[in-house]
């Protein structure tokens, strides 16, 4: 099975050469993490490991800092293949890096209690389903910060550039609630290149991206309506081109990107503050 995000040079969505100084990027991120931790007087990092490519890359680079790294596996009604990939990745890092330790915190009972307490019928209309799905992400954020504070560790984000700044494919105050974001300036395609350089397990490199927030399998592409390479292309032309400048799938993708990008601004802009006129304060 080919990697789902591989994009060929004949693709209409090709934006530039896929070559990258992967080793230099890895060293740069590791150094950035070390320097930030030192400035923050933190002992290291806590990372939620899902079995996906982003968390695998972040945790593998964090391991190379030499600082304490706590990897949390936090299943909530998780699919067996996601659990096995996460556990395999944690074991591999623990075997190589003495500064890495893993921990499993099964949040399914807590989540089930919450769902029962708020009386959500999970077959009800989509808004309730989405709210409950986002509750999974927020429960994991709470857990990461608990162990982060307990151990003097920075909660380390795993969002990529497309998710964090392109289409807002993250949960506000969920996986978007972090102290630092080491790979948020990298596209998904670039992260796959780094994963190959880091020798991330093939099972993770070949897994179809999913956010893991649903009982049924919902891929990222199905939820967003476009693949990561398509959205990377859209991000590169957004602001200089309009959907009407293109035809067919390119036009459709840029329309999707434009809609998602506009809708996600509340996730990245500062919290609005009601400014009181100066004369009212005298």
Question: Can you describe what each PLM-predicted range is?
Answer:
Residues 138:
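Catalytic-core regions of hydrolytic enzymes
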Residues 2-45, 60-70, 77-80, 88-135, ...:
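ATP/NTP-dependent adenylation/nucleotidyl-transfer catalytic domains that generate, transfer
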């Amino acid at each position: 099975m080919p990697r789902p995000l591989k994009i060929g040079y004949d693709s209409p969505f090709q934006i530039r050469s896929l070559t990258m100084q992967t080793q230099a990027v890895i060293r740069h991120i590791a150094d950035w993490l070390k320097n930030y931790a030192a400035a923050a007087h933190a002992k290291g990092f806590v990372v939620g490991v899902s079995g996906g490519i982003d968390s695998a890359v972040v945790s593998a680079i964090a391991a190379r800092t030499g600082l304490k790294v706590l990897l949390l596996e936090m299943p909530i009604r998780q699919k067996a293949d996601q659990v096995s990939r996460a556990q395999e990745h944690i074991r591999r890092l623990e075997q190589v890096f003495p500064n890495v330790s893993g921990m499993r915190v099964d949040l399914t009972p807590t989540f089930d209690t919450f769902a029962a307490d708020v009386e959500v019928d999970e077959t009800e209309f989509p808004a309730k389903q989405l709210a409950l799905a986002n509750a999974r992400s927020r429960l994991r954020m709470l857990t990461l910060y608990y162990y982060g504070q307990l151990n003097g560790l920075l909660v380390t984000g795993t969002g990529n550039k497309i998710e964090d700044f392109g289409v807002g494919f993250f949960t506000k105050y969920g996986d978007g609630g972090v102290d630092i974001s080491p790979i948020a300036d990298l596209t998904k395609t670039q992260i796959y290149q780094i994963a190959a350089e880091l020798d991330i397990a093939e099972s993770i490199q070949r897994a179809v991206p999913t956010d893991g927030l649903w009982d049924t399998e919902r891929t990222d592409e199905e939820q967003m309506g476009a693949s990561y390479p398509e959205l990377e292309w859209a991000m590169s032309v957004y602001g200089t081109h309009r959907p009407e400048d293109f035809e067919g799938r390119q036009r459709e993708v840029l329309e999707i990107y434009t809609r998602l990008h506009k809708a996600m601004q509340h996730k990245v802009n500062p919290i609005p503050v009601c400014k009181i006129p100066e004369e009212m304060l005298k």
